[in-house]
Amino acid sequence: KLNRDADVAGPDVDGNGVRDDLDAYINSLPDTEPQKKALRQGYRVLRNLLLLDTTDTTAVLDGMRNSAASIWCIYSRYGSDANKKSGEVEKYTVNTEERFKAYARFNAAASGHSAVMPRGDGCDE
């Protein structure tokens, strides 16, 4: 069951940057461990985008770079299923009005800027 608290961050008891409900979802998947790591990176990065100070241009640009890397990582680990997986990351993370508004603020702040695709597969691990 997805967390729908008014809190944008949501619970993260283990402090890995991924909401606990999404961590449980990832753990329940039959995917490979490298694929699960890619999903965790995607969920962590998107959660961070919702929480960053959108008045800080450096933070926004860093967020854009991290987002591009996490998407590239998912594509490198999932191949033809990557588009579906990337869509799930967004759908499951931005699942309340408060989170949607935070995501809209980030996207508005990022508008007009460009990000460079990462070197390699974009994966943290």
Task: List each model region and its residues.
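Calcium-binding acidic motifs and repeat modules
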Residues: 1-15, 21-125
